[in-house]
């Protein structure tokens, strides 16, 4: 009887030992889940802080540009996608993508204001380095972008034009403006991008205007260049994959 009891105890012990790993495994899984939840909360908090920081820096830059770009043919607006600087008037000669030299000073001023802004130099601000490093360690980078968008009116180009359509003309104009800004601002080219929309995103729909003078005035407003200053988060791995795809294509 005693031998039988010892055998039963021995089986119980073996069963207990055989399931002991499950309890340890469950504890490890619980700890890992807790760690990842805590990490997500910390990243979310850091992202909110950085988003608030970016918005504050954009607000400051907007105020500086509003004061520093007090020209009749330039408007500065604070939008959800950053700061928009709109240049109208005879920035370019008719059917040409060359910037009129009389606007060089204005472009120089725009470039310098952007280059000196805290947003453009955020990585050099000591008080924000720890926050940026937290993101970089988790595979996320902050990108600052200066995007130039060219727009023309709906008038057809003459047969002897250097450009087949307003699309190409608007793209060439925005690219030339970007080059000038890059030259005057002294910033790396990686911050800049140029787009051309032709006549397809007008401020005023001239098709609804019958009066000739009013139509010409509307077309003058549609001929414009918009410069956007913005910042956004980007996954470093996805960014690298995108660069590799662009290189291959």
Question: What residue spans do the PLM features occupy?
Answer:
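Short terminal targeting/anchoring segments
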Residues: 1-88
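Periplasmic OmpA-like peptidoglycan-binding domain that tethers envelope proteins to the cell wall
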Residues: 99-101, 128-249
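Short amphipathic alpha-helical segments
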Residues: 49, 53-57, 61, 102, ...
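Short, solvent-exposed beta-strand/turn patches at coil↔beta or beta↔helix junctions
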Residues: 79-124, 155-164
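Short beta-strand elements
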Residues: 68-81, 121-136, 140-147
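Solvent-exposed residues in well-ordered beta-strands and their adjoining turns
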Residues: 38, 88, 115, 228-232
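Structured segments of extracytoplasmic/periplasmic soluble domains
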Residues: 60, 64, 68, 109-121, ...
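Envelope-exposed proteins and targeting segments
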Residues: 70-72, 79-83, 87-90, 95, ...
């Amino acid at each position: 009887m005693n031998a039988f009891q010892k055998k039963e105890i021995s089986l119980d012990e073996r069963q207990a030992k055989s399931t002991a790993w499950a309890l340890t495994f469950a504890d490890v899984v619980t700890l890992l889940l807790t760690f990842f939840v805590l990490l997500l909360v910390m990243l979310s908090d850091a992202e909110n802080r950085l988003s608030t920081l970016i918005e504050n820096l954009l607000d400051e830059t907007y105020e500086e540009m509003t004061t520093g770009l007090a020209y009749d043919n330039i408007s500065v607006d604070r939008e959800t996608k950053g700061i928009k600087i709109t240049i109208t008037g005879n920035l370019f000669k008719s059917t040409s993508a060359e910037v009129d030299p009389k606007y060089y000073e204005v472009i120089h001023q725009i470039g310098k204001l952007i280059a000196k802004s805290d947003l453009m130099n955020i990585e050099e601000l000591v008080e924000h380095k720890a926050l940026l490093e937290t993101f970089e360690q988790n595979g996320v980078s902050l990108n600052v972008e200066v995007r130039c968008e060219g727009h023309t009116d709906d008038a057809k180009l003459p047969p002897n034009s250097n450009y087949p359509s307003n699309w190409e003309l608007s793209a060439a104009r925005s690219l030339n403006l970007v080059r000038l800004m890059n030259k005057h601002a002294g910033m790396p080219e990686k911050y800049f991008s140029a787009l051309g929309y032709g006549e397809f995103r007008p401020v005023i729909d001239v098709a609804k205007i019958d009066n000739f003078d009013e139509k010409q005035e509307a077309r003058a407003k549609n001929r414009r260049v918009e410069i956007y200053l913005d910042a956004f988060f980007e996954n470093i791995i996805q960014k690298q994959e995108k660069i590799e795809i662009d290189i291959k294509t």
